């Protein structure tokens, strides 16, 4: 199972990108609905290590489950 970044809660800090050991977190195009940069997780590459959840400053922005409907890849 993979993790999910909730697109509309992401504030674009990108601590998850730097912390991910397999580089499966990517920047999305444009801004989300709160006018912030946003990131998405490649479900196929995620190793479910939970480091992204630990470093994310926004509670609830990264879920410990795969929820494609909450995470978009492109704007």
UniProtKB/Swiss-Prot annotation:
Cofactor: [4Fe-4S] cluster; [3Fe-4S] cluster
Family annotation (InterPro entries): 4Fe4S_Fe-S-bd (IPR017896), 4Fe4S_Fe_S_CS (IPR017900)
Regions crossing the membrane: none
UniProt protein name: Uncharacterized protein in rpl9-rpl11 intergenic region
Keyword Transcription regulation: no
Domain of life: Eukaryota
Keyword Repeat attributed: yes
Localization in the cell: Plastid, Chloroplast
Binding site residues for [4Fe-4S] cluster: 20, 46, 49, 52
Ligand binding ([3Fe-4S] cluster): 10, 16, 56
Residue span, 4Fe-4S ferredoxin-type domain: 2-30, 37-68
UniProt xrefs under PROSITE patterns: 4FE4S_FER_1, 4FE4S_FER_2
GO cellular component: chloroplast
Bound cofactor: record note: Binds 1 [4Fe-4S] cluster. Binds 1 [3Fe-4S] cluster.
Main localization, broad class: plastid
Signal peptide, first to last residue: none
GO molecular function: 3 iron, 4 sulfur cluster binding; 4 iron, 4 sulfur cluster binding; metal ion binding
UniProt keyword list: 3Fe-4S, 4Fe-4S, Chloroplast, Electron transport, Iron, Iron-sulfur, Metal-binding, Plastid, Repeat, Transport
